Amino acid sequence: MNAEELLKRYAAGERDFTKVDLAKAKLINAHLVGVNLWGANLEGANLAKAKLWGANLTGANLINANLTRANLCGAKLTEANLRKARLNYAKLYGANLSGACYDNSTHFSRGFDPDSQQMRKV
């Protein structure tokens, strides 16, 4: 599936995109509120400024994904792979990041404490 098809199906009311492969997808400023991307492959995807509040990204592969200024309020990112991801200025209020993994290359906003969110450093 590509970004265009995802957005078209989302606009038609579909919300369940479990395990979809959207590696390197360009979803800048996409409106995907409440979308289910459980186990999705979003490696290298550009989700900058995306509206993902309430989204289910449990177990998603977000390696090297750009989530700069994305709205992830209330999103589920449990066990997500955030190695090398960019989350600068991302809104994470109420997001569940427990068990999500990150590394020294993962970029968070200043003052964000991954340990307080029960994240795992790998």
Features from the language model and the residues they span:
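Tandem repeat scaffolds
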Residues: 2-122
